[in-house]
């Protein structure tokens, strides 16, 4: 973000995306791993905290330089430097965090999402694979959870945002159904009009 700000003048419209693939490859205590949710679940919130600490330090360093210049400025430069301080553009940008498949059931998803939000994530991405069977995005043989289970995890993330007072938190819900078999792709319908029936009505055979 320091380089981005130097090049563009500010970081408006920019963000950081912490993908599960990147975390698994670079932040696991077990060393580089494939994108199969084998890294420690706390790796993402820990990295969010680390990044925000670094970005705030970048702000502090740049502002510190400006205040030093202000202290040593003559009358001609003081107004210009004061305006730079007042119009300072932060290095801090939104962070999108990949929670993979939630690392467990809906409650586990809620607890981890809450930790990510507390660390500073404003957006959480979740996918509908079974956590214990997670495959890399380019691989076949994926196993997806039932639709109701996925919705429970999405709601768990929503509840985490609301509990922490973040009313405009963003959830990116991604499906891997195309790479999964029909056993998990089709929703179970118990009666007309239920959630499963609504999903099945969208399928054209």
Predicted regions and their residues:
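Phosphate/pyrophosphate-binding betaalpha-module
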Residues: 123, 146-169, 186-195, 199
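Short, well-ordered coil/turn segments that N-cap beta-strands
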Residues: 12-14, 90-93, 121-122, 165-169
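Active-site beta-loop-alpha junctions enriched in small/polar residues
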Residues: 1, 21-23, 100-104, 129-131, ...
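Hydrophobic faces of well-ordered beta-strands that scaffold small-molecule active sites
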Residues: 14-18, 95-99, 124-126, 171-175
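Active-site beta->alpha loop and helix N-cap motifs at the rims of alpha/beta catalytic domains
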Residues: 34-151, 182-187
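Generic structural signal for hydrophobic
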Residues: 4-8, 51, 116, 157
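N-terminal glycine-rich anion-binding loops that anchor highly charged ligand groups
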Residues: 2-28
